[in-house]
From Swiss-Prot:
NCBIfam families: PRK05461.1
Organism: Methylorubrum extorquens (strain PA1)
This protein's name: Protein ApaG
GO biological process: error-free translesion synthesis
Superkingdom of the organism of origin: Bacteria
Length: 130
């Protein structure tokens, strides 16, 4: 489990390899990740957008930006949380993801809440030791 906190917004990510959606012989590796966002702060916030950096095992980086998460822009009162699960296909058996959520306060102030960097590791990864 990976965690980061920014201005009272705790983001926890738990990734997993999804064998049934993967086809290693065709260089297709699918990963799911569950995110929990907890408002440990003292004011209401709303998740407005997301920004992901996805880096595969060869070092190729893809950036993804979009409004909200899974079609929602949740509002979190102090003490509330929101969880969702999404997925990421890669052409390599490993990689990593990191990013941020743009949050806004009830007063209209925006800030970036860090999504912790987390590794995507499949059992098909062959490690070479010299």
């Amino acid at each position: 489990m990976y965690k980061a906190e920014t201005r009272g917004i705790m983001v926890t990510v738990e990734p997993r390899f999804v064998e049934e959606e993967s086809s290693p012989g065709e260089s297709r590796y699918f990963f799911a990740y569950t995110v929990e966002i907890v408002n440990n702060g003292s004011e209401q916030v709303q998740l407005r957008s997301r920004h992901w950096r996805i880096i595969d095992g060869r070092g190729a980086c893809q950036e993804v930006r979009g409004a909200g998460v899974v079609g929602k822009q949740p509002v979190l009162e102090p003490g509330e949380s929101f969880s969702y699960t999404s997925g990421c296909p890669l052409t390599t058996p490993d990689g990593l993801m990191a990013g941020s959520y743009t949050m806004s306060t009830i007063g209209g102030e925006s800030f970036e809440a860090e999504i912790p960097a987390f590794s995507l590791d499949s059992p098909h990864l062959r490690r070479v030791v010299h």
